[in-house]
């Protein structure tokens, strides 16, 4: 049986000094025989998805200690992508993922913790903690802060979210009063933004990976039911420690739970629910930490056979995460996928011996358990608040309509191909990604004229100045992991295209990425990126580009000889923006750019380069 990792710092005469320090934190003699559980919290007052997490660590800690463990809490950083967006702050968002992963590794390894409870929520925090967990490979469970309630206003017949506020603000016909009303109403409570944006997508995927409890991705931050997830996480992590350290059962380790098949399950769910394209980036990064051969080829294969079973904002205005929960949450989507033969259900999870057992217990269409049905009736109260567990509103009924409801069966899918696709072609030899769930079917094949911008800032100025016309394909380059650096999100350009009435008349291609709030024909992650010699850097104003989603292709319509001639010319000039960019690139960002890979590798550090630099 493996020894507790913490024994390194708690046993032996030579550790008297370390024990003295442990005692100064409150530990007693009997505690040195127990597992030390690291609680990786991410509370901050900067981020609405994390503003309510201040007391969550101690809530979990008390339950850990009741169950026989020793809990020690620390915090990671957390960047709010929405607040950081539209200015140089967005350069720091993706690099913060690596900082979060490293900080968890540093704290856990420096103090020899035996297991981790990851309290995450928003865009880069869940992926960063996931990367660290798979890197460390010790018992772990994820419990997130939960989704925000959708906003309500008399000026709109549908629920509001952050994107609605951005779009209306860019609409020159909207009055200041209307903009102010949307702004005040769009984000009414604590929690991660209310649609199927990156944060909620990733929290849902932790359920499919087997590393979180059912309801983790969908139970509202404000609802009293969510408290039980935190309490259960505290009990579960101690049990996972017992199984591994006392019973020598390594099936509970994250690399054995989140194995290749589990990554396929997570991606299958992502495609079926039309999740954010950022999830592809983060799953690729996490797979590398787990040393799993999972790449865009696998995602491309899955995208061709998995139907879209769920549509949520920003892909449709009718539904938000509160509606997904009412329809049975993630385990009901998994149940439909399993019935369609699209899941590996023989895999372990942190809460069930197999995923099949979990689905049987938690899919509302399979179980008669009234407690499960009551749990999924938890709904929004419509009261602005920053307080967790502050309301206990319930719907009168569940949404179990699998023909026309929020969650559909395979037979009644929104579409027989899923909500994400990988495109290849001479403009993106290593691939690029598009959220097809947000693309009108009429423009799944689109040929247009390239309109080149060498930064997001210049693209925004150009769109607002009406330089972009119907039929254009906006190309924003040198915004990849190296070129940005930091691979900015392009929510403002896509939102402004919509506000200009060009949402169905234009496309956008970038080596940057998109917010989970993006919809429209928005293609990101073009790899290799321009700064790494990618062909997106060879496109010129007015070039014809053909996008063909059904055939999974994207091509610059010039011949090979012309492409080769342009490449030779660009090699002489150097792969950098033509226009100067008033952008301060700090030492921290330069360090990230030096080691960053393109998006097809998850924008992680180049480990081969690192091994050369530090053998």
Curated annotation (Swiss-Prot):
What positions does UniProt annotate as the active site of this protein?
Answer: 515
Cofactors: [2Fe-2S] cluster; Mg(2+)
Concerning its family, UniProt says: Belongs to the IlvD/Edd family.
Biological or metabolic pathway of the protein = Amino-acid biosynthesis; L-isoleucine biosynthesis; L-isoleucine from 2-oxobutanoate: step 3/4; Amino-acid biosynthesis; L-valine biosynthesis; L-valine from pyruvate: step 3/4
* First-tier enzyme category under EC: lyase
- Listed name of the protein: Dihydroxy-acid dehydratase
Swiss-Prot/TrEMBL GO biological process terms: isoleucine biosynthetic process; L-valine biosynthetic process
InterPro entries assigned: Dihydro-acid_dehy_C, DihydroxyA_deHydtase, DiOHA_6PGluconate_deHydtase_CS, ILV_EDD_C, ILV_EDD_N, IlvD/EDD_N
In terms of Pfam families, this protein maps to: ILV_EDD_C (PF24877), ILVD_EDD_N (PF00920)
